[in-house]
Amino acid sequence: MIKAILIFNNHGKPRLSKFYQPYSEDTQQQIIRETFHLVSKRDENVCNFLEGGLLIGGSDNKLIYRHYATLYFVFCVDSSESELGILDLIQVFVETLDKCFENVCELDLIFHVDKVHNILAEMVMGGMVLETNMNEIVTQIDAQNKLEKSEAGLAGAPARAVSAVKNMNLPEIPRNINIGDISIKVPNLPSFK
């Protein structure tokens, strides 16, 4: 099971943290600091797996990470997870971010944190891997983006309706409105203009 997913830069600033087990906020901050110190001290040419720190569960857990440019992508997992499988999952995550943001960088993670969390939620839920097919993940994210855009259009609908009514050129104000069998009497109103 995946216990946490952490992304931080070369200076230890967290850019994303997702915990799948309950930890207090102080403990989460300690885990992030400890993980950064463990991972950042390692040479580039060494293995990308190491035993979890004391806070994340000790020797029963592993830290699996990759370092891309200025960012560390770290998955904290228990012993039931495959190290190579998680390395591949990190690669899929980074490539998916790259497709969604067209050459992802640290600023994308800062300014589009909600979208990054959506991408991550398509891949991992409750510490379990849901999807590893990058094309399927991108398709789902594109569908979410289209839905958000269509909902944004609905938010302005009342204002557009009021504007349309104000701009209507009626020769006179109707006194009765007939809709099918229903007749509605319109009270005397001042001019719309």
Swiss-Prot record:
Positions of modified residues (Phosphoserine): S191
Pfam families found in the cross-reference section: Clat_adaptor_s (PF01217)
Tissue-specificity statement: Present in all adult tissues examined.
Gene3D superfamilies named in the record: 3.30.450.60
Annotated membrane topology: Peripheral membrane protein
The keyword Protein transport appears for this protein: yes
Family matches, as InterPro entries: AP_complex_ssu, AP_mu_sigma_su, APS3, Clathrin_sm-chain_CS, Longin-like_dom_sf
GO CC terms of this entry: AP-3 adaptor complex; AP-type membrane coat adaptor complex; axon cytoplasm; cytoplasmic vesicle membrane; early endosome; Golgi apparatus; intracellular membrane-bounded organelle; presynapse
Subcellular location: Golgi apparatus; Cytoplasmic vesicle membrane
Keywords: Cytoplasmic vesicle, Golgi apparatus, Membrane, Phosphoprotein, Protein transport, Transport
Single Gene Ontology BP annotation: anterograde synaptic vesicle transport
Key word Transport present: yes
Function noted in UniProt: Part of the AP-3 complex, an adaptor-related complex which is not clathrin-associated. The complex is associated with the Golgi region as well as more peripheral structures. It facilitates the budding of vesicles from the Golgi membrane and may be directly involved in trafficking to lysosomes. In concert with the BLOC-1 complex, AP-3 is required to target cargos into vesicles assembled at cell bodies for delivery into neurites and nerve terminals.
PANTHER family: ADAPTOR COMPLEXES SMALL SUBUNIT FAMILY
Oligomeric form and interacting partners: Adaptor protein complex 3 (AP-3) is a heterotetramer composed of two large adaptins (delta-type subunit AP3D1 and beta-type subunit AP3B1 or AP3B2), a medium adaptin (mu-type subunit AP3M1 or AP3M2) and a small adaptin (sigma-type subunit APS1 or AP3S2). Interacts with AGAP1. AP-3 associates with the BLOC-1 complex.
Protein family: Belongs to the adaptor complexes small subunit family.
UniProt protein name: AP-3 complex subunit sigma-1
